[in-house]
């Protein structure tokens, strides 16, 4: 199926939109209403992404499934713990997936992030390790915040702290990407090897 490249602002809107709805609903009502609104917004974002791009990035799809599962548990059991540990589960799952990929001689980072650039096997390996460590850091950070801070603070961090932190980290990886990026002339030949971290 044909994949369309969306405007960066569209991608930002589909990622930030549900979080802003979550924050606004929590501020006006409570965490349980916010959780329900967040679940609806996540599903809407996935549908819109598919309509516009003709596909849904794997990371967004996995996140949506976990949001629905843990959000549903939060509402059914009326226990806010489930929605609060949801980010921890997501970050830990991504980190484990990346590390398992390295053990298998593959880098799943290209699939996870729907990347379009081509890197050498060494570059993919370094990038995978860095992102796996970042995900572990975010998992620990989420645990610390929801266990030590108020619900409102945790919601605000989720809405306004996670994306900036991720964006800053991603930007700090650009020198590595440029250093190990495969030249345009050989990029086409490397398509079949994308994400391969096995030694040559």
Swiss-Prot record:
Keywords: Cell inner membrane, Cell membrane, Membrane, Transmembrane, Transmembrane helix. The keyword Transmembrane helix applies. Pfam families: IspA. The chain crosses the membrane at residues 32-52, 56-76, 93-113, 126-146, 153-173. It is found in: Cell inner membrane. The keyword Ubl conjugation does not apply. It comes from the Bacteria. GO terms for cellular component: plasma membrane. InterPro entries: YciB. It is a multi-pass membrane protein. Plays a role in cell envelope biogenesis, maintenance of cell envelope integrity and membrane homeostasis. NCBIfam families: ispZ, PRK00259.1-1. Belongs to the YciB family. This is Inner membrane-spanning protein YciB. It comes from Afipia carboxidovorans (strain ATCC 49405 / DSM 1227 / KCTC 32145 / OM5).
């Amino acid at each position: 199926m044909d994949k369309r490249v969306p405007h960066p602002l569209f991608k930002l809107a589909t990622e930030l939109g549900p979080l802003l709805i979550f924050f606004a609903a929590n501020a006006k009502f409570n965490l349980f209403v916010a959780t329900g609104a967040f679940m609806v917004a996540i599903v809407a974002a996935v549908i819109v992404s598919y309509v516009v791009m003709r596909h849904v990035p794997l990371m967004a799809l996995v996140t949506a499934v976990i949001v629905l599962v843990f959000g549903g548990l939060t509402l059914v059991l009326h226990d806010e713990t489930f929605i609060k540990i949801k980010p921890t589960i997501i970050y830990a799952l991504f980190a484990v997936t990346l590390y398992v990929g390295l053990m298998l001689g593959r880098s799943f980072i290209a699939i996870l992030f729907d990347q379009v650039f081509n890197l050498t096997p060494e570059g993919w390996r370094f990038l995978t390790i860095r992102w796996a460590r970042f995900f572990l850091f975010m998992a620990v950070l989420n645990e610390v915040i929801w266990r030590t801070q108020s619900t409102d603070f945790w919601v605000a961090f989720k809405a306004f702290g996670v994306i900036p932190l991720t964006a800053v980290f991603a930007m700090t990886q650009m020198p590595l990407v440029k250093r190990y990026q495969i030249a345009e002339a050989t990029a086409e030949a490397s398509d079949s090897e994308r994400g391969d971290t096995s030694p040559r």
